[in-house]
């Protein structure tokens, strides 16, 4: 992580100085390459061994915590610097703070640099924000423990059952869909709550996606911090 932060710091400074798309592409290749090395090398090697009956050794690299999320954040920062949406951060410590914000590091939401750019310099903690943060975190924790986990256990019961009917598949499908939503949105709620306690205002990550009337609308409402990257 420290190496990636340093790379992002240097790449962003070079992008800001030279306005070069080539430097941006180089930065993207480096960060995505590191992500693939840590997450997918052993998967690729295992498949090669299976397909060609080889005995290549697995690297068994320890995957850095939150690598997917902080890679997306670094990429969005470098892209926004290139587009001129944000000023380049010349303070390495503040850039590191942005990348390593612990509330959302593991499960999101993916926080754009422009969202907290000012708060890195002039963050204010208030009683109202702290109270809201506690409430939001508690709500997320309850969604995870009382709803998502229970739905997960229900799905296990269905999978281990012997009777497989049309009604079974309907109930299982609905339970599984709700489990995914409550599990993921619970982590986002907890991250938003923790961030608010420390004076950071993260954007919402879910907006009732299951009431969507189209795939496009669903995409806009589900994992908003990711889908907004492609606009």
Question: Which functions belong to the PLM regions below?
Answer:
Residues 1-231:
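Membrane-embedded transmembrane alpha-helical bundles that form the catalytic cores
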């Amino acid at each position: 992580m420290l190496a990636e932060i340093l790379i992002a710091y240097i790449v962003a400074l070079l992008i800001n100085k030279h306005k070069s798309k080539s430097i941006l592409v180089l930065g993207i290749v480096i960060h995505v390459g590191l992500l693939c090395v840590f997450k997918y090398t052993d998967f690729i090697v295992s498949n090669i061994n299976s397909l060609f009956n080889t005995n290549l050794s697995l690297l068994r690299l320890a995957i850095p915590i939150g690598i997917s999320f902080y890679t997306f954040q670094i990429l969005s920062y470098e892209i926004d610097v290139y587009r001129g949406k944000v000023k380049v951060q010349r303070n390495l410590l503040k850039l590191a703070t942005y990348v390593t914000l612990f509330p959302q590091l593991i499960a999101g939401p993916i926080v754009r640099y422009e969202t907290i750019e000012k708060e890195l310099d002039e963050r204010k903690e208030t009683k109202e924000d702290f109270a809201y943060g506690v409430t939001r975190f508690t709500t997320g924790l309850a969604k995870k423990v009382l709803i998502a986990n229970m739905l997960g256990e229900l799905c296990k019961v269905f999978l281990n059952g012997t009777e497989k009917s049309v009604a079974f598949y309907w109930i299982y499908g609905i339970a599984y869909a709700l489990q995914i939503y409550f599990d993921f949105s619970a982590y986002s709620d907890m991250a938003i709550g923790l961030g608010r306690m420390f004076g950071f205002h993260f954007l919402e990550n879910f907006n009732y996606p299951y009431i969507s009337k189209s795939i496009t609308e669903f995409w806009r409402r589900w994992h908003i911090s990711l889908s907004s990257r492609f606009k």
